[in-house]
Amino acid sequence: MEKWWFNSMLSNEELEHACGLSKSMESLGPIGNTSGGEDHIINNMDKNIHSWGDSGSSSCSNVYPLFGVRGIQGFISDDTFLVRDSNGDSYSIYFDIENKIFEIDNDHSFLSELESSFSSYQNNGSNSDNPYYDRYIYDTKYSWNNYINSCIDSYLRSEIRIDSYILSGSDNYSDSYIYSYICSECVNSSESSSIKTSTNGSDLNIRGRYNDLDLNKKYRHLWVQCENCYGLNYKKFFRSKMNICEQCGYHLKMSSSDRIELSIDTGTWDPMDEDMVSMDPIEFHSEEELYKDRINSYQRKTGLTEAVQTGIGQLNGIPIAIGVMDFQFMGGSMGSVVGEKITRLIEYATNRSLPVIIVCASGGARMQEGSLSLMQMAKISSASYNYQSNKKLFYVSILTSPTTGGVTASFGMLGDIIIAEPNAYIAFAGKRVIEQTLNKTVPDGSQTAEYLFHKGLFDPIVPRNLLKGVLSELFQLHGFFPLNSNSIK
């Protein structure tokens, strides 16, 4: 038995590399190993399986799948398939998703018995009942690569109960990744749902009760689910994509640290007031959790001391002062520490004549600090007035999703240039609060960046991947230039 380890998300190129298949899939030769084995391939030298030709190259000829044994109840395991190559040799193909094993066996005695039983099965009049037979037996139209991809897709659907989506269609797998969506259409966990798939002309019905939260929790180390289209993004590459959904282009939330890394040149970030923490000024107590305990919990969870990071750095060589709010820390709520850190940042920039960027992501004033949190609105606005009106310096406000409450009512809307991210939720009061207060229905989409842009609420809507270049041009337009010309990108 020869075993190949494989990942549950495969492209054709990855499959070809792992199994010794070449890109020339029009004609496949005898199944076997490539002459140069990888470390992750386990070779059983006792098996006499043909190599890829005399030269050790990967040139191929046709492989004919005999049947998928799902059509024969109880014959062999549901994840085993029988194929035949151009030399007439038969092989059984076995998939084990849980243990990530791909096995090929050419035990002739076993396979002869298997084929004999299969022939008997077919002669008993079951040809028409077996959906795999009519389409695949001795049919060179479907290549080995297409067949294996379809088998993996069908196995993924049934084994781990996910809805697979093949980008290039159900009949042509030659250029497609197998993208797996865990409950891609949001299904109520209390309802019984059915997935209906077409497998080579037959309908495969899978019924079960799905629990979205359990599934997301199970696979969250691999995937990030889009809030807009519910598609899955591979977590390993998600950060390099700037947290933008590959399926629909939706901008998902980013941590403050990721935003700093996105905007600030490498090695130039110098944080300010990192040791400043809240002391629970009004001794707010909740039946559920003490305010201090909640602060400590978020500090451990996020690695931050408060809901904003402030500091100085360079953006394409231009010295700037920047504050970035983090929605992951108590919803980015603005308390006395957040207000103090932003005020000190603006005052520092005023004294050094630096441009200021503040990235807003907040639910508003922090209720656990009462009127002290509301006071921060006036304090920051006062510092901003001196910076902008008296010193004539340049302040850019960037509104991300969500920006609401006291932040919207103060420094969020005070920028000389106000930039919004696509699809950002921007409001003073939330939809539910407005509807309950005024007894009026708030239209869907009336608090999104695109709608508010047409109402003149801010200046441009800038996608994340273009933001750094736009900011650099704005600063140079307003007289802030790189420390050296080589820094311009």
Swiss-Prot record:
Zinc finger regions, C4-type: 226-248
Binding site for Zn(2+): 226, 229, 245, 248
Pathway: Lipid metabolism; malonyl-CoA biosynthesis; malonyl-CoA from acetyl-CoA: step 1/1
Assigned EC number: 2.1.3.15
Primary localisation category: plastid
A UniProt-annotated Pfam family: Carboxyl_trans
Molecular function in Gene Ontology: acetyl-CoA carboxylase activity; ATP binding; carboxyl- or carbamoyltransferase activity; zinc ion binding
Protein name in the entry: Acetyl-coenzyme A carboxylase carboxyl transferase subunit beta, chloroplastic
Annotated source species: Buxus microphylla (Littleleaf boxwood)
Gene: accD
